[in-house]
A protein has these predicted regions:
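Helix-loop "lid/cap" segments that line or gate small-molecule binding pockets
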Residues: 14-22, 31-41, 117-122
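Hydrophobic alpha-helical segments that form the core
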Residues: 32, 78-97, 113-118
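Helical cap/lid subdomains and adjacent loops of hydrolase enzymes that gate the active-site channel
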Residues: 1-2, 18, 31-34, 48-54
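Hydrophobic alpha-helical connector segments
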Residues: 1-28, 80, 84-87, 127-132
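Amphipathic alpha-helical packing segments from all-alpha helical-bundle domains
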Residues: 7-10, 22-24, 43-71, 81-85
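Hydrophobic core segments within long, regular secondary-structure runs in both alpha-
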Residues: 10-13, 55-58, 62, 108-119
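Amphipathic C-terminal alpha-helical segment
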Residues: 19-22, 67, 87-105, 119-130
């Protein structure tokens, strides 16, 4: 069991944002993932593979958040599905915006701000992020 699940998650997410902003292959891969147009051949296979990775990432997010709750790093009332959805959608939104408007967002410089904000929301959640009885 990971003793610092949020620290490990933060490191992973920082690495992902760094790679997307510095490595053309990662940029192309995420452009394909977020492309809603029909694709063929290798691009379609890559998108299908990455969608499966996204499903697995979401599952892993829920597991990581559950571990953080068990360790007392996050509130025990946290709705794990909603929290994982918030993280996933916000990260996807940042990436999509960067792909379309790279001059608007510096993923490397904004990574700490984004992750501090998201983890702060999870540590001190609004009532809408808590499980309902």
């Amino acid at each position: 069991q990971e003793q610092d699940p949020l620290g490990k998650l933060r490191g992973f997410l920082n690495e992902v944002m760094y790679k997307i902003s510095t490595e053309p292959a990662h940029q192309q891969m995420f452009t394909i993932i977020f492309n809603l147009e029909p694709l063929e051949g290798e691009a379609e296979a890559l998108r299908d593979h990455m969608r499966l990775q996204s499903i697995n990432f979401f599952r892993d997010l829920e597991i990581t958040l559950a571990n953080a709750v068990r360790l007392g790093h996050l509130p025990k009332e946290l709705d794990l599905r909603r929290a994982a959805t918030l993280l996933h959608c916000t990260l996807d939104g940042y990436i999509v915006n960067w792909l379309h408007f790279p001059e608007r967002i510096d993923l490397i410089k904004e990574a700490d701000f984004l992750l501090d904000t998201l983890f702060g929301l999870l540590a001190n959640p609004s009532p809408s992020l808590l499980r309902r009885p």
